[in-house]
Design a protein with these regions (language model features):
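Short intrinsically disordered terminal tails
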Residues: 1, 285-286
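Consensus positions within tandem repeat domains that build extended binding/scaffold surfaces
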Residues: 38-41, 60-63, 83-88, 107-110, ...
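Short, aromatic/basic amphipathic alpha-helical patches
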Residues: 236-241, 259-272
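Short, low-complexity, Pro/Ser/Thr/Gly-rich segments in the mature regions of secreted, periplasmic
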Residues: 279-285
Length: 286
């Protein structure tokens, strides 16, 4: 595609073209009919400055990996799925404040490292309907590390998120508080290295918390389990390398379950760090 701007009207032709089997040598790529960007479609298209695809709803894995875009125009409100590593390491010029109201599926590392990079600085992300559904391939079977190393990310809104993926916010060092009201499970290493995280509020549906999900959260003060009716399962290493284990942070639970938590399997190791939510309204907001 030697022209500086390529505009196509036959969407069937474009479905064939956008398969990473051609060279993009122009500076601008625009099409108003394409709805799906296939895997690696713009992979390492380093000469490309601008992509305009307003009809796209699905973004394939590694779609913008290795690009140097200065402008990416998508109708973000219509995006339904984003594949593995699509915007990894800041490629693709993602907006600083990103809302994806239609998004239902995310691939591993989709936005990993998309902060303080050459092309983007993702600051806030809102995922109103995402429940944790993933996009997988033969080599990556889950949505691990979706936002890992987004060091400028300060705010996350995912009110419908059920399963917090493994390593999903690892080393997001600008995060200070997080709320996941419907989370049922927390993956290993989900918040590892979030060194400014002081408070995390998990709703009453949580049933399990996996290994080291809060490790090296060096400013953590409170893990709040608001509304739980049973004691969630934890592993031997769930609170490894945390301020909870060192006696500097607390787990806040409903008063009616405080004593149950303190004698529960593995929780009993942290009995001195378990407090009743009702006794600390300034911290727990109740």
């Amino acid at each position: 595609m030697a022209n500086s701007i390529a505009t196509y009207t036959d969407s069937q032709i474009m479905k064939c073209l956008l398969t990473h089997d051609f060279d993009l040598i122009g500076k601008r790529f625009e099409d108003n009919l394409i709805t799906k960007i296939k895997t690696g479609a713009f992979f390492e298209a380093t000469n490309l400055d601008e992509v305009v695809l307003p009809a796209v709803t699905h973004i394939g894995s590694m779609a913008f990996a290795g690009t140097n875009l200065t402008t990416l125009t998508l109708t973000w409100a219509n995006i339904v799925s984003i594949g593995i590593g699509a915007f990894q390491d800041g490629f693709g010029k993602v907006p600083q404040n990103l809302t994806l109201p239609s998004l239902t599926a995310l691939g591993a590392g989709a936005f990993a490292g998309a902060s303080d990079a050459k092309n983007t600085e993702l600051r806030t992300i809102s995922l109103p309907i995402w429940t944790g559904s993933s996009i997988s391939d033969e080599s990556i079977s889950s949505n691990t590390g979706i936002f890992a190393y987004c060091s400028a990310l300060t705010s996350v809104s995912a009110p419908e998120l059920l399963a917090i993926p493994m390593s999903s916010f690892q080393y997001c060092t600008a995060l200070t508080e997080l709320v996941f009201p419907k989370a049922t499970s927390i993956g290993s290493g989900s918040f590892t290295g979030c060194t400014n995280l002081t408070k995390i509020d998990i709703g009453g549906a949580v049933t399990s918390m996996n290994s080291s999900f809060l490790s090296t959260t060096t400013k953590l003060e409170a893990l709040i389990l608001l509304g739980v009716t049973t004691v969630p399962n934890i592993g031997n290493s769930t609170f490894n390398d945390t301020r909870i284990a060192s006696g500097q942070a607390y787990v806040y639970v409903p008063k009616s379950l405080e004593d149950t938590f303190k004698v529960a399997n593995r929780w009993s190791n942290y009995a001195s760090q378990i407090r009743a939510i009702e006794d600390y309204p300034a911290i727990c907001g109740s």
